[in-house]
Amino acid sequence: MARTEGDTWDIVTSVGATALVVSAMRAIEARKPEPLARDDYAQHFVAATKAEAPLFSELLEDPEAAQAPDIQLFSSYLGARTKYFDEFFLTAGNAGVRQAVILAAGLDVRGYRLPWAAGTTVYELDLPKVLEFKKQVLDEHNARATATVLDLHVDLRDDWPTVLKAAGFDPAQPTAWLAEGLLPFLPGAAQDLLFERIADLSAPGSRVAVEDFGAPGNQADRMSNAMQNEEGALQRIFKSIVEEDAPPSSLWFGDEREDPARWLTGHGWTVEATTAGELLKRYNRVPLAGEHELTDAMGQSRYFTAVLGA
């Protein structure tokens, strides 16, 4: 189904189901001999949706399927992404930041698996059905938070700053913000407003980490085309969560938007950028290059962090 301005979802439909894709890949990454990131809860999210979304469970239950080139590539890509943003939060904590905001948190469990500094509060923002599902699974497996974790049920297209401040967020204190796997799912105007709001709520010393697919027609479309064209388990998974014959990009908004790194630079933030290909080299994982359309598309995905000066 094509995206609309006020659409909504649960964990097994539309945008919500993409969080299950990420969980499945994180579970596969965690089983590798030297995982880039270890998320021991990811497999439980997949298992909890076996009846409604069997493809994800089948992937984890079939070792041969998990070894397919497309799955190994995508799990490495998401493993590198996860590690990069884990390091972002740990660096922020070492710099004295004690409040973190995970935008469109989905099935992110950093509040339960990272070694947060004492006194840290992690605010998770997402739709009610998504966060309720996550909490139910975590409770069933006796998960224990490693920080104060507050789930805030709010759509990022709505007035989320009011909800955030009502929960105790202090704009006078530095914050670590995360926008991971989020931007293509927002309309252009909502993305631009997102960064304006982040800037308005950020004290000096605040940090933001972003996965950026770039302008419409560029990286987002390359990723979508590669996922659609790469025959195998990954293609079947994405076909299961979009309309028949629709590309993965049907879940995304393709309207014009500001370049967030350029915008932040112009508003006093110092930006450092990298790509998925560079990260995989840094983490001593086989670089994404040349063998598949998917490798080239993923390798060009851009990540950046930014710090707000005094």
From Swiss-Prot:
Keywords: Methyltransferase, S-adenosyl-L-methionine, Transferase. Exhibits S-adenosyl-L-methionine-dependent methyltransferase activity. Belongs to the UPF0677 family. The keyword rRNA-binding does not apply. PANTHER family: S-ADENOSYL-L-METHIONINE-DEPENDENT METHYLTRANSFERASE YKTD-RELATED, S-ADENOSYL-L-METHIONINE-DEPENDENT METHYLTRANSFERASES SUPERFAMILY PROTEIN. Its EC number is 2.1.1.-. S-adenosyl-L-methionine binds at D126, D155, L156. It is an enzyme of class 2 (transferase). The lineage of its organism: Bacteria, Bacillati, Actinomycetota, Actinomycetes, Mycobacteriales. GO terms for molecular function: methyltransferase activity. Pfam families: LCM. InterPro entries: Ppm1/Ppm2/Tcmp, SAM-dependent_MTases_sf, SAM_mthyl_Trfase_ML2640-like. The keyword Methyltransferase applies. This is Putative S-adenosyl-L-methionine-dependent methyltransferase MAB_4587c. One of its GO terms (biological process) is methylation.
